[in-house]
UniProtKB/Swiss-Prot annotation:
EC number from the UniProt entry: 3.4.22.-
Sample GO molecular function, one term: cysteine-type endopeptidase activity
Coiled-coil regions listed in the entry: none
Annotated protein name in UniProt: Metacaspase-1B
Pfam families: Peptidase_C14
Annotated stretches, region: Disordered: 1-109
Amino acid sequence: MYHPNYNYPPPQPGWGGGYYPPPQQHQQQQQWSPPPPQPYYSNGYPPPSQSPHSYSPPQYPPHGQYEYGHHTPTPPPSSGSQYRSYHSHSPSWGQMPPRPPMEAQQFGKGAPSNYRFQYSACTGRRKALLIGINYAGQPNALRGCINDVTNMSTFLHERYGYRREDMVILTDDQQNPMSVPTKANILRAMQWLVKDAQRNDSLFIHFSGHGGRTPDLDGDEEDGYDDVIYPVDYRTAGHIVDDDMHAIMVRPLQPGVRLTAIFDSCHSGTALDLPYVYSTQGILKEPNLAKEAAQDLFSAITSYGQGDFASVAQTAIGFLKKAALGESARERTVKTKTSPADVVMFSGSKDTQTSADTFQDGQARGALSWAFIKTLQARPNQSYLQLLNSIRSELEGKYSQKPQLSCSHPLDTNLLFVM
């Protein structure tokens, strides 16, 4: 693992998240105010109010001191499967799913006219960014996030041929200030991840830590809220908004570049603002306001019975925003957030759900991170649909969260999952 010297300028203020000055009181009042945090990955609530005193702002080394190396691409694990038709049928468990087609694909209805995307063969260079934040020494600390990153690093190296030299690992137990997951370091590492990416390269980002929500300012969210993640220095630097992560890691990618994202945090359903979200039947999801109204009503009744009147009000406001913005927000997202690249994300929960900090295989783990690794170790050659259902099956009966599959383009969910 190389220590980073990113040498990239910070995002411009127009990105909406950028590098914030220390948050002022009036800024805090504008954010959604959820109920007190539970022992989960934030429950949509920022990490504890105590300042992360263990971490001072990083002092960046001189140019060249922590450079990344450049290495010959490592070929992917061999497979005897040949490419098949894009329009594939759902394979059985004993059948190898078809590999992705190499010709350009059309987006179809709802996307810009004459817009095409390209699947990645994942035969080029591999790079990975792994971020795990336990928020050590803070009242709302987590236990499993650093373990998640350690396990994911080993899994990527042993199963998918990612070189240790091409991984950047940011965790809050490291002494090197460039390896601490501050907002500045995370944003620079995201820029490093996608820099100079070429067709058939395979990029990977894994975030395990606190997540939450903040009011949507650009009208691209069906529920009126943006998803956010919390760096270790969120108290002084602010959170990182999904719009910014999309602008940094999705928008610059060329056709045929693969970015696989695993977000094991609360309210992470659309953490990269990918417009195509799929059900466990492989069907593209559309806003269903009638169903969501029933779910929100049940949530409100439950909160009322528990005396949580703040949640009742938030639920009501949230549904009213969905009703007013849902269809137009989706249309805006499809028009502005599609990509010719091959970006796929598995998230720990829906936008409205929390994600569990759990104990599995003798150590604290994030539920999604654990299930993702376990199911691919047991059955490496799964389709996207099989993988989504396998992950959900691992969590079903243990946790209430429902992991999500989303993509930057229309996805044939019966194709072989590759990365």
